Amino acid sequence: MTKFTGAWTEEEVESYLRDAAIPIRLACHRPDESLWMVALWYRYRNGTFECSTWAEADVVRYLRNDSEIAFEVSSNHPPYRGVRGNGSTSLAEDEGKAVLRDLLERYLGGTDSELARWLLSEDREEVRIRVNPRRVYSWDYTDRMQGVATGE
């Protein structure tokens, strides 16, 4: 069961995560127990984040070794707001690259680009990373940053 705290209700968090087309930052442990951070495209539904990445990516190896993570999805321009938390991950084949295709639609507006064609090529195997949050904390500095120009 996910615990939601902070500035927003669970419904407001879910709305933000569905609408914000910015990467999720995942922090995990490397096998030597040092920390590693990676930014990935995500989709949020049914209380979980789903990402897709190359099966040979370092983060896949790290998550196979230790599934515990911390995460953040936040704006880079004022007014600053977002969510952070922790949880665990599970890995599976991204069958038919379904998650990747959805992410290409979400972040690039479709699959008609050189990047999309490369990511969808037959010789690339993709892994779905599912993030199961335990704790989600939201913050929103909109009120305190009134009058600050936005960069978005």
Go through each PLM region and give its residues.
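Short, basic/aromatic recognition patches
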Residues: M1-R25
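A short, polar/charged loop/turn motif at coil->beta-strand junctions and beta-hairpin connectors
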Residues: Y16-A20, P79, E125
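Short beta-strand segments
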Residues: A21-A55, R61-L63, I69-V73, G82-G85
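Charged, gly/pro-rich active-site loop segments
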Residues: M1-W8, R81-E152
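Short, intrinsically disordered, mixed-charge
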Residues: R64-I69, E105, G109
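Short, surface-exposed beta-strand-loop junctions and turns on beta-sheet-rich folds
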Residues: A57-V59, P78, M145-Q146
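A generic structural signal for nonpolar/aromatic side chains embedded in well-ordered alpha-helices
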Residues: Y16-L17, L63, L103, V131
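Structural motif corresponding to alpha-helix initiation and N-cap regions
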Residues: E10-E11, E56-A57, S113
